[in-house]
């Protein structure tokens, strides 16, 4: 029997799915976590066209924007990691309303220059903003007053190259992956108090003592399949599914690889998972128990798969771009490639899909708008901004919100069909 909390959570997700342009973008990849929206986004823009406002963002942070109730929230950090903060920008004007210092580490852990000290994306739910900086700290802030409601700095992890996994909400919990050089676990915190509700260590045989090969930067996903709700949480070497209420392990699959960052997707009764190395990309039937490596893998695909950019599923197709700019369309059911197209540019941002159009931001300032066309690669527009994107785009109304390495933009124009 579905409990009331889960029923309420399902209603929230369904409301976000059907709300169209009015939906709030409350977590990494939006309210449903898959980078899809019914908003009528602009097709073309530049520094001098269709930019409603442009706000400078000092510091170095790759966290994606989130939005609720007319406020855009961004995790931020100084380049040296000595100040970790939460920035609030008015969605209507681009004005910075708050810049809240959350943590000031005296001796920040090492962060690889390609990463940042503020790469995990915040979550907004129930009038609270949850901000996560890996082991440097996790905090809850009142969206209305900006007051810090609680904070934690006692969740250990040597990220070795900086944090990357974003927190996700589930009912009254906040769930976070910690897959580090030294320890690997998943933890659920009470949203109201920050206390630990459950913590489950990874049960993966990594086959090595090298902590660098145990790292992962993935954001998990929660869904219900055949009446069973599950938290699918990729790690290095394997992916584990847990009961999101208790942390009990349900199933796991060994696929090799490490440094996974792209968020998994659930569609057509399959979970699509990818990682760097190993099997690279695979689809798993999520109805098993225990080790399902030999029994529940539907297909594998290993050519030009991404490490960082999360994919999008539109209809029966999976669309993706890899880190080096190779676009691919696969059939979700079979894993068969329908087409592949090589373009220029390096990519970290997740794909955003709106009404059959894929918005693909690269690290040099170009955003390609590509049709979700299963028959061929179809470029609809190519748009340039002054600086590139490590963060993934967000949606406010029928506008795009893009965080580049230097600025935050709200991009809008005539509604597209």
Indicate where each model-derived feature is located.
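N-terminal secretory signal peptides that target proteins for export/translocation
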Residues: 1-4
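Noncatalytic, solvent-exposed loop/strand surfaces
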Residues: 20-417
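Bacterial N-terminal signal peptides
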Residues: 8-17
């Amino acid at each position: 029997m579905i409990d009331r909390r889960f029923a309420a959570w399902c209603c929230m997700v369904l409301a976000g799915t059907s709300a169209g342009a009015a939906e709030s973008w409350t977590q990494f990849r939006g309210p449903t976590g898959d980078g899809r929206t019914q908003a009528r986004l602009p097709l073309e823009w530049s520094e001098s066209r269709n930019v409603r406002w442009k706000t400078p963002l000092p510091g170095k942070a790759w966290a994606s924007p989130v939005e609720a109730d007319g406020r855009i929230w961004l995790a931020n950090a100084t380049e040296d990691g000595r100040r970790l903060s939460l920035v609030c920008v008015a969605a209507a004007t681009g004005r910075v309303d708050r810049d809240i210092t959350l943590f000031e580490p005296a001796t920040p852990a090492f962060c690889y220059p390609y990463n940042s000290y503020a790469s995990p994306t915040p979550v907004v739910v129930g009038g609270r903003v949850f901000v996560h900086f890996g082991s440097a700290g996790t905090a809850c802030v009142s969206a209305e007053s900006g007051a810090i409601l609680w904070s934690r700095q006692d969740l250990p992890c040597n990220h070795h190259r900086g944090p990357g996994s974003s927190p996700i909400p589930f009912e009254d919990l906040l769930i976070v992956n910690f897959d580090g050089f030294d320890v690997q676990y998943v933890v659920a915190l009470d949203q109201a108090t920050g206390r630990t509700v459950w913590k489950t260590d990874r049960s993966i045989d990594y086959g090595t003592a090298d902590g660098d090969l145990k790292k992962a930067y993935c954001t998990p996903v929660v869904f219900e399949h055949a009446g069973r709700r599950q938290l699918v949480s990729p790690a290095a070497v394997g992916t584990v599914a847990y009961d999101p209420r208790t942390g009990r392990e349900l199933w796991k699959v060994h696929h090799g690889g490490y440094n996974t960052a792209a968020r998994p997707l659930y569609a057509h009764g399959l979970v699509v998972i990818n990682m760097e190395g190993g099997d690279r990309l695979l689809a798993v039937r999520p109805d098993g128990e225990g080790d399902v490596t030999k029994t529940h893998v539907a297909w594998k695909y290993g050519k030009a798969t991404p490490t960082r950019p999360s994919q999008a599923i539109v209809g029966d197709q999976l669309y993706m771009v890899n880190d080096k700019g190779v676009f691919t369309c696969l059939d979700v059911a079979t894993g068969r490639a329908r087409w592949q197209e090589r373009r220029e540019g390096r990519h970290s941002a997740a794909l955003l899909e709106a009404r059959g159009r894929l918005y693909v931001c690269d690290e040099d300032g170009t955003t390609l708008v590509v049709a979700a066309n299963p028959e061929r690669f179809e470029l609809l527009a190519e748009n340039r901004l002054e600086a590139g994107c490590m963060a993934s785009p967000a949606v406010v109304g029928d506008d795009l919100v893009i965080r580049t390495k230097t600025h935050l933009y709200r991009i809008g124009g005539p509604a597209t069909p």
